[in-house]
Structures are given as C-alpha cells and as structure tokens.
C-alpha cells in the first residue's frame, strides 16, 4: 500500500513538473516569436497561450472598445502547420478570418463589443503527434 501511494505521489509530481515546463516553454516562445509582431501596438496585460495538438480548437472571448485601434496576433509553433483563426461577434457571425494565412489582423470598431477569437489547428496524418504553443496577443494604440 505504501509503495502504491509513493508511486502515485511521484506520478502526480511528474505531471505537475511537465505542465509547468510546457507553460514556461510557451512563455519563452511567445516572448521570442510573437511579441515582435505587435510592432508599435501596446500589449494588453493578459497572457493567453495554450499547448495544442493537431485537430484541437480553442476560443477566447475579449472586450474590444469602440474607437481604439487594435492588432490581434495569433502566433503558433510551426510544427502545428497552418493554424486558422477568426473573429466572431456575439451572435457568431464571422467578422474576419485569416484565409490568407496571416498571423495578425488590425481593426478598429465603432462601438464597444465582445468578440470571440476562434482557433483551429489542422489535423495531421503523422504517426507521431506533435504539440505546440499557440498564443493570442492583443495590442492597442490611439
């Protein structure tokens, strides 16, 4: 019984370590590869990133204030392939999609509203499933 408990604790500690390591690597990836895409836009204070695998989808709701110029950046590790993303209003209507493969969009809204950023990682037929960081950054300027 003690041996089982010991292995369970060791297993849980290993999971916690690997989760913290993945988060740390994702932060470093974001700082190195994604932050420069904001250029002269001021980054908001939120860090939004996740480790995803082929076939995954994610969604993030964010408030956009009227009259402010924004840059939305979705930056992903190349191992994930051509990650798609789009902006949607509260009724689910598409406002913009990166059909051209762009990693960012610049926009300004007349009225304050909540928008959803939806991301989808393409499926892969590879025998080995790779995971990679996907970061969403929001910058603004007046």
Model-identified regions with their sequence ranges:
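N-terminal secretory signal peptides that target proteins for export/translocation
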Residues: 1-5
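Sec-dependent N-terminal signal peptides
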Residues: 7-18
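Processing junctions and N-termini across compartments
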Residues: 18-20, 28, 127
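Predominantly extracellular/luminal regions of secreted and cell-surface proteins
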Residues: 22-41
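Acidic, Ser/Thr/Pro-rich low-complexity intrinsically disordered segments
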Residues: 24-25, 50-129, 140-142
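A short, polar/charged loop/turn motif at coil->beta-strand junctions and beta-hairpin connectors
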Residues: 43-44, 54
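Eukaryotic complex-assembly/interaction regions
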Residues: 132-137
